[in-house]
């Protein structure tokens, strides 16, 4: 009786409904400020390359480090471009690290990205250390996002970036102009304190909750402050040059990455379909083999034994078919791995020309920025000693 139930349960089904997800292709509108923001109150934004999230993956995830590294930069740059279109901010830059002092910081982690679904954990805080947002964003896209016939070059996951931008703007609009100006002042004082702690340490203090507050302000004609502002202008020059690098990188990888993501989407959907079909076929095959063996053992007639043999043979065919479909799914995933490797050439080190020097990015961008910071510190001390 139990065997009969098993054979009944594992009989292959022909219907495959419910495998593909239904998604919306409607573009989410990007919000703009409710009222114009004065230039002096426009906050600068720094977006660090996202954490690749590789430490959160397991052996079953089809994740390739070289792709995730590229995505970490690409996604940050995509968010920057979306936020720029809102007209609600000052300079929006992808920065090498959160060591770059700015008014608003955006960081995050890639939790999932396979061409079909993207999940990001995003954190936003300001120069005071006050957290604005800590939220998980998720979007699942459909096959039409990759339909070449639609000639749609928009990012398939643009809605996710728009939602992040809208949420950040929503928090920004809760701030008064005075509070925004205070944030900009704190950013300047933090930068000044970094280069001359003995001169600027007393101007800002840390409250019990860990956020910063202004104790008092230096004179506008303070010579040390004026030198620090010149140093900060040079820092902006470097960061803007780095933004050109990030923009160029994103443009270079865009078409190749969209092809990769389209293939990844198709592979993920196909692999899921094959995996589900394969599981049913494998279990059905095992059940049919057991039924055939059980029937041969219990049958006392030739006809019964022949029927049982046929049942077992059918079960063997179904089992083989199921395993072949699983192997086919693995082949699709392997194809994604090959495409991921092809992106390595587009994240090679580049040479950046500055006004009076050339910076070669042979290591990490963060490492290069640390060298730049050390150079600025040296320039500041030389200029201060010359006065």
Show where each model-derived region lies.
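Bacterial N-terminal signal peptides
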Residues: 1-9
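C-terminal/domain-edge helix-coil "capping" segments
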Residues: 15-40, 140-279, 297-303, 316-387
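N-terminal segment of the mature soluble domain
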Residues: 41-100, 130, 163, 167, ...
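Acidic helix-start/capping segments at beta-turn-to-alpha-helix junctions
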Residues: 93-109, 183-190
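Amphipathic beta-strand/beta-sheet edge segments enriched in Tyr/Trp
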Residues: 107-148
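Short, glycine/alanine-rich hydrophobic alpha-helices that insert into or span membranes
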Residues: 281-293, 311-317
